[in-house]
Amino acid sequence: MTSSGSLVAGAVLPENYARHANYHVKTIQAYEPHGLHVNYVSLNNEPTCCPSINYPSILLITSSQMATMLKDDWFPAFKANHLTTKILLLDFNWGNADLVEPL
């Protein structure tokens, strides 16, 4: 699913954007029967944390890739499944503004 072929590092490949969105849909739905509502999810998982200890992470993709992923895959998947969960962007490593490509 990622460019590294691993849970560690690597970015989600464009051909897997829909699969990635559906993974999050299914995860969110799995919590609901237990009375747990997921309010927020994030596109990235600590992309600059701990590569030396094989910490699962998803690397940054460009802002334009994020926009495409959201527009074409995440928003439609959430809407089709009537999810009200919000999607966070760039919610990690706030001190590293250089990691962000302006839209």
State the predicted function of each range.
Residues 1-102:
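Substrate-binding cleft and catalytic face of glycoside hydrolase catalytic domains
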